[in-house]
């Protein structure tokens, strides 16, 4: 059985159970779920969606910490813990250096995103306290004409006003 946590109304659709939750108010009830085998947590405010005011920076950080801490709090209550937690993280962890490829053991940067990622990963690592294998995916921005940052740039490219994104 697949369960998807959503801010929308709870419902059952196409063999998927949608469960309402609100990480900001720490509201989630998993008591009716018999077991959770694994969790995939991709929750967090978009980093490409708004001007980075102080209040939006707070939203970027809190949306990640609140969702992760709420999942941890609810998982602690389950008799049978999941065997795997997969959490989104970000390549924004690393120092800004375009001359050398970054590797996992490289040191954290000193900017806002680096701090967000470090706090987010620390929160995610709480799952290990219960013997839950924890995998954190340090991913970059989503590049698809259907979503993410590229969706916003796609109209510019269609008008032949775009420039190469980078070498990869």
Model-predicted regions and their roles:
Residues 14, 49-57, 96-99, 148, ...:
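Conserved catalytic-core motifs of eukaryotic protein kinase domains, centered on the activation segment
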Residues 5-10, 22-23:
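N-terminal Rossmann-fold cofactor-binding loop
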Residues 118, 128, 133-136, 140-168:
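NAD(P)-dependent short-chain dehydrogenase/reductase
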Residues 17-70:
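NAD(P)H-binding glycine-rich loop region in Rossmannoid oxidoreductase-like domains
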Residues 5, 39-43, 85-91, 137-139:
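SDR active-site strand-loop-helix element
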Residues 1:
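N-terminal Rossmann NAD(P)H-binding glycine-rich loop of SDR-like oxidoreductase domains
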Residues 69-111:
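Conserved Rossmann-fold NAD(P)-dependent oxidoreductase catalytic core, especially the SDR/UDP-sugar
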Residues 62, 98-136:
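Catalytic helix-loop patch of NAD(P)-dependent Rossmann-fold dehydrogenases
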